[in-house]
Amino acid sequence: MRKLKLQMQVSLDLFISSTESGMNWMIWPYGGEWTWDEELKKYFNDVTASNDTILLGWDMADGGYIDHWTNIALQKGNAQSAFAANVVAAHKHVFSRKKRKSRWDNTTTTTEDLATEVLRLKNLPGRDMIAYGGATFANALVRTGLIDEYHFIVNPAILGKGVSIFTKMDDMLTLAPSSARVYPCGVSVLIYHRR
């Protein structure tokens, strides 16, 4: 069975965005100059390349995620083009509450029950899957109990309040640590797996 990984940039207090300052607390807020050090970029690219399927919520996909990385993949010499090429090559599976037609290549949209569809995808042949998302989609995935690995890219900032992926939890979530690493740019990567 394929593994499902959730990768999120978070603050030290595990918020994914600030209610007041958006994402400017991140060392690299997914645009412009890629300010991570080379070792962290390699981790990021390697994790993405190890998957052949990306799960997204409709809001993130429609909000420009797929279009942005498709454009970056075409920019030869862009430091982010290796990551972008992996995004373009992977099959994107976009979840929506409403029936919608995909306007992107290599993408399927679905209104199927999230847990049922994720379990079906996990049982298909292929490499692992990775999910990126906004808070609503990530929280829904967490609540399915089907995430095998949590990859937290922890920025050295404490927000005090903000948007979390761990709201509306029905049960306590117990994880086991897999690895932890601090990178020269100040970001730590914490990887946990489901017990």
Show where each model-derived region lies:
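Enzymes that bind and transform nitrogen-containing heteroaromatic metabolites
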Residues: M1-R195
